[in-house]
Amino acid sequence: MNLSDFDYFLPDELIAQEPLPERDMSRLMVVRLDGKEFEHRLFKDIVDYLNPGDALVINETKVIPARLVGRKEGTGARIELLLLRRLDSSRWEALVRPGKKAPKGTAVVFGEGLLACRILDSTAYGGRVVEFSFEGLFEEVLERVGVMPLPPYIKKPLLDQQRYQTIYARQAGSAAAPTAGLHFSPGLLSRIREMGVAVIPVLLHVGLGTFRPVRTEDIRRHRMHAEYYEITEEASRAIAETRARGGRVIAVGTTTTRCLESAAEEGGRVRPGSGWTEIFIYPGYRFKVIDGLVTNFHLPKSTLIMMVAALAGRERILAAYREAVGLRYRFFSFGDAMLII
């Protein structure tokens, strides 16, 4: 299966540059797994497609201010870091730009000396291992020095940083938002619970595995970067109870899907625990846990569009994307949503 099989045409003006004023007023395209025609609604209408006894599984990760802009000691050259994952109390894996100006041993200072780092080594995927020096709690220093890591296709400054967090974000650690969850408002989530749908939290910290581009034409040669996940005993039990009563398990987002499918056992049981996942889901994959998916519209040739194609079929997803372009849906992180069910 080739990378070009997952390409599509998208005019630049359809890339959403800011969130809508109301989270749940984005548009919703419904893609039915039974092959019925696509439906076009508002996101708040998602309740019309949920049944009492179903479960929505959400990713409660929280985005950290993972983007750091500093100066190289000695030359003053501008160096930018994107924190990917924490290794211990002072060491992180990070993407560094420009990489050619940041060989092993490079020292970088951020925030007028509040934070500094030294580059210790390179990683297999072109990143760096960096060691920070600071006083106090790293999280507090990062809040003062770091900024929200918006994707590069968003050119407009984000005035309200909380709009790049889900309303249920709890555990800090992501370098990007689980964007399908951005559409849920407190009122909508309450309404979903009141109608007898379980809302089950799991955790996957979004890192390079989610947004790293595919560089190989044969997609089977692509290797995912590991991302950390956790599933509690309570969440595992709640999913099993949903299955037992005949309900559907609907994942909110591709990151939730990766989490659940990484811990899946035959028969649809989800194993509780924590670990690192490198699962790569593309057409031909047999889903073990999820029956439906809430997701955004993804970049051409990305691992994320490959995942939704694995669930709904490549040709059907590309047809849905063509229709969305024709109807001028808003795309990517701050864009509109799709429900595959």
Swiss-Prot record:
EC number(s) stated in the UniProt entry for this protein: 2.4.99.17
Cystine crosslinks: none
Superkingdom assignment: Bacteria
GO BP annotations listed: queuosine biosynthetic process; tRNA wobble guanine modification
Pathway: tRNA modification; tRNA-queuosine biosynthesis
One GO cellular component term noted in the UniProt record for this chain: cytoplasm
InterPro entries: QueA, QueA_dom1, QueA_dom2, QueA_sf
Cellular localisation: Cytoplasm
Catalytic activity: 7-aminomethyl-7-carbaguanosine(34) in tRNA + S-adenosyl-L-methionine = epoxyqueuosine(34) in tRNA + adenine + L-methionine + 2 H(+)
First-tier enzyme category under EC: transferase
GO molecular function: S-adenosylmethionine:tRNA ribosyltransferase-isomerase activity
Alphabetically ordered keywords of this record: Cytoplasm, Queuosine biosynthesis, S-adenosyl-L-methionine, Transferase
Family note: Belongs to the QueA family.
Oligomeric and partner information: Monomer.
Function per UniProt: Transfers and isomerizes the ribose moiety from AdoMet to the 7-aminomethyl group of 7-deazaguanine (preQ1-tRNA) to give epoxyqueuosine (oQ-tRNA).
Protein name: S-adenosylmethionine:tRNA ribosyltransferase-isomerase
Native species: Pelotomaculum thermopropionicum (strain DSM 13744 / JCM 10971 / SI)
Gene expressing this chain: queA
